[in-house]
């Protein structure tokens, strides 16, 4: 959808956290979280495309879609509960759309197969929603919490390993000055360049330019 989606490419996010915190421990499976998030929103994503293709965009707009998939405040401890709440919210909206479009089953399934043909899968839906929403509402809040926990973990390690208070103070100060912020590091993230979606884009551009 946009560069923000690629910057949020799930397999690259651990390295972004390392760049922010200088701590390479893995404390939360961000790729799995985004996979489950994608699976949860996929049915509504298909409905969004269905409405657009059928000229009824006003009845379920992108803004309606984004409102339906909002997560609320993220925390590491409640990540599973957040996803479960999302699944229930999506299910309610899907039921509403089915009731509003009782004859749409076959055309909905056709759209579903077509978006899969185009490369969107239930596991990777996050890459194809509005980029700003993904960046600002889903990935950044998640990474802020992960990085805060990693920073606290590293600060605790430094404190325990220090021989005296002066060393502890100096090393903690040095560590603090070495930290980066999540938004800056995400915007510098080029880990998507080896991804299948990015290479598909390159291939499409090459084919397009070759036709001219």
Per-region residue spans from a language model:
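Acidic, divalent-metal-binding catalytic cores of TOPRIM
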Residues: 1-212
């Amino acid at each position: 959808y946009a560069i923000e989606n690629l910057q949020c490419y799930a397999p690259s996010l651990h390295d972004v956290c390392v760049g922010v915190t200088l701590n390479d421990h893995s404390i939360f499976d961000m790729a799995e979280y985004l996979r489950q998030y994608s699976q949860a929103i996929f049915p509504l994503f298909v409905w969004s495309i269905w409405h657009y293709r059928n000229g009824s965009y006003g009845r379920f707009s992108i803004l309606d879609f984004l409102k339906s998939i909002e997560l609320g405040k993220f925390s590491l401890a409640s990540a599973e509960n957040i996803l479960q709440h999302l699944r229930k919210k999506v299910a309610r909206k899907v039921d509403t759309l089915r009731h509003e479009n009782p004859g749409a089953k076959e055309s909905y399934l056709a759209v579903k197969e077509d978006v899969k043909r185009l490369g969107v899968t239930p596991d990777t839906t996050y890459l194809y929603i509005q980029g700003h929403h993904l960046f600002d509402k889903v990935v950044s809040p998640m990474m802020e919490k992960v990085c805060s926990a990693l920073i606290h973990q590293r600060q605790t390690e430094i404190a325990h390993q220090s021989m005296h208070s002066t060393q502890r103070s100096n090393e903690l100060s040095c560590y603090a000055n070495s930290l980066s912020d999540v938004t800056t590091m995400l915007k510098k993230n080029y880990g998507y360049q080896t991804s299948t979606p990015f290479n598909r884009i390159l291939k499409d551009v090459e084919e397009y330019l070759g036709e001219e």
